[in-house]
Amino acid sequence: MNQGIDLQESFIKSLTDLGLSGGLAKAIWMPLPMFLMIIAATVGVLVCVWLERKISAAVQQRIGPEYAGPLGVLQPVADGLKLVFKEDVVPAKADPWLFLFGPILVVMPVFVSYLIVPFGQNLLITDLNVGIFLWISLSSIAPIGLLMAGYASNNKYSLLGGLRAAAQSISYEIPLALSVLAIVMMSNSLSTIDIVEQQSGYGILGWNIWRQPVGFLIFWIAALAECERLPFDLPEAEEELVAGYQTEYAGMKFALFYVGSYVNLVLSALVFAVLYLGGWEFPIPVNALAGWLGVSETNPWLQIITASLGITMTVLKAYFLIFIAILLRWTVPRVRIDQLLDLGWKFLLPVSLVNLLLTAALKLAFPFAFGG
C-alpha cells in the first residue's frame, strides 16, 4: 500500500538541510500540528455557520446573508467579531469559577478530539492505537461542563437545560459507543488509520456503510443527539427554556458554546466519514493513477496529488453529512424529552447491542467479508 508523504519527516528534513539541529527542528514542528488543527477547525466552523444560514434561507424561501462579502461568506466572521466585543456579564448570584470553567470543559475535549481524525495515510496529528477509545472518552467530558454551566448560572432555565443535556448525552453515548465497537471488531483495531485501510481495495463497495447499515443509522442518530441538533435540541429549546444552559451567558463565554456546538458537528461528520465512508479513499486506485500519469507510485508529485485528493474526499464526505444535518434541523420538528429518552434507552440501546452480537456472529461465519 502506498504510504503517502510523511509531513513530519519531510518538514524536519527541510529544516535540517537549512542548517538547524535535529532537536531544534523537532521543537519547531511540535506546536505546528496543534496550531493547524485549531485553524482548520475554526475555518470549518465558519463554513458550517455560513452553510447553515444559506441553507435555512433556501428552505424558508429567503436570500440569507448577502452583504458581508460575496454571497455573505464573511457573515460568520462578523458574528464572531460581534461576540468578541460584547460585554462579558457574570450574574450576581452565579458561581464565578464554575461559570467560567463550564464552557471551557465543553470546548476543549472537542478540539483535542481532532487529534485522531486522519485526512490521509500520514495526514493526522497522531496515530494512536486507541484513537477511537480516546474520542469516546473525550466526548464523555462535555456533559460535565454543560451541567456545570447550568448549575453555576443559578437560573432555573439554565439548570433544567444542564440536566437535560446530561441526560441526553448519557442516553446516546452508549448506543454511539456500541455502534463504533462493531466497526472496531471488523477492523481489529482502535486506530482510525487501520479502520480506513480496512475499507480500501474495493472502492466504494469496501465502505463499512454496506456492512453496517444498522450501525451507521444508530451512529448518525446518536451523533445528532450528542451535538444537540434538531430534532434533539432539548437542552436549549427556545420555546421552553429560553436558551437552556446558555441563558445567562454572553460575550466570549457564549461564543465558546456556539463554536463548540459547530466544532462537534464537524468532528462527528469527519469521524462518520472515517468509520463508514472510507475516509480519504477515493474510487481511483493509486496504481491506476500512477499508470495514467506514467510515473512511479513513490513519485513525490504523485504523493502530493493523492494527499490533496485524500483531504478533499474526507472534507467533501463530511460536509455532505453536515448538509443533511442542516436540512434535518429546518425540516423536522423537535421531539419531547420523554420521546428522546425512550428512543435512546428503549430502542437504540437494544438495537445497537443486537447489531454488535450480529457483527460478531458474521465475523465468525464470514471472516473474509467481516474482517476475520
Swiss-Prot record:
Q: Which reaction does it catalyse?
A: a plastoquinone + NADH + (n+1) H(+)(in) = a plastoquinol + NAD(+) + n H(+)(out); a plastoquinone + NADPH + (n+1) H(+)(in) = a plastoquinol + NADP(+) + n H(+)(out)
| Membrane association type | Multi-pass membrane protein
Q: Name one Pfam family in it.
A: NADHdh
Keywords from the named record: Membrane, NAD, NADP, Plastoquinone, Quinone, Thylakoid, Translocase, Transmembrane, Transmembrane helix
Chief location category: membrane
One annotated GO biological process:
photosynthesis, light reaction
UniProt cross-references to InterPro entries, sorted A to Z: NADH_UbQ_OxRdtase_su1/FPO, NADH_UbQ_OxRdtase_su1_CS
> EC number(s) for this protein?
7.1.1.-
Signal sequence, start to end: none
Q: Which GO terms describe its molecular function?
A: NADH dehydrogenase activity; oxidoreductase activity, acting on NAD(P)H, quinone or similar compound as acceptor; quinone binding
Q: Which GO terms describe its cellular component?
A: plasma membrane-derived thylakoid membrane
Which PROSITE patterns does the entry mention? COMPLEX1_ND1_1, COMPLEX1_ND1_2
Question: Matching PANTHER family, A to Z?
Answer: NADH DEHYDROGENASE SUBUNIT 1 (PTHR11432), NADH-UBIQUINONE OXIDOREDUCTASE CHAIN 1 (PTHR11432:SF3)
Function recorded in the entry: NDH-1 shuttles electrons from an unknown electron donor, via FMN and iron-sulfur (Fe-S) centers, to quinones in the respiratory and/or the photosynthetic chain. The immediate electron acceptor for the enzyme in this species is believed to be plastoquinone. Couples the redox reaction to proton translocation, and thus conserves the redox energy in a proton gradient.
Record-linked NCBIfam families: PRK06076.1-2 (NF004741), PRK06076.1-5 (NF004744)
Family, according to the entry, reads as follows: Belongs to the complex I subunit 1 family.
Q: What is this protein called?
A: NAD(P)H-quinone oxidoreductase subunit 1
Organism, scientific name: Microcystis aeruginosa (strain NIES-843 / IAM M-2473)
The record's gene field reads ndhA
